[in-house]
Amino acid sequence: MVSVSTENVELVKRIYDAWGREASARDYLADDIEYVNPSYAVEPGVRYGRDSFRVVRDTYGDFKVRPVEFLDAGPEDVVVLAHYTASGSGSGVPVTGEHGYIWSVRGGKAVRFRWFQSHRETLEAAGLDRDDSA
């Protein structure tokens, strides 16, 4: 029998797989998913709904995320440590870096998405302790 947390990790992997193919991941997201921007974001706070993800795509038309690790962080949470590349849609200035994400999954759908600017910050927010985090 596959554990719920393993199923959650697989669901989050399917989201990134869909995005990697430039396909929709809507089927994996709850209609009212919470998209949580950190306090230091240009627009901090919580957005609701699947369309929240479109804002990033519209701001950074070529925003690409390359997950490097998926971690089971409890009964509902999945941590994704990733690297990203993008360029501003208006300026064309290239941007690269690392991000971390915490996805909360319930009932076979992602219900909450939080992002962080570093792997270390993500691991701390998830309550995971790793000495090798960057």
Language-model features: where?
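A beta-strand edge to alpha-helix "cap/lid" segment located at domain peripheries
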Residues: M1-K13, V55-A134
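A solvent-exposed, acidic/Ser-Thr-rich amphipathic alpha-helical stretch
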Residues: E22, R26-E76
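Short acidic-aromatic low-complexity motifs
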Residues: V2-D31
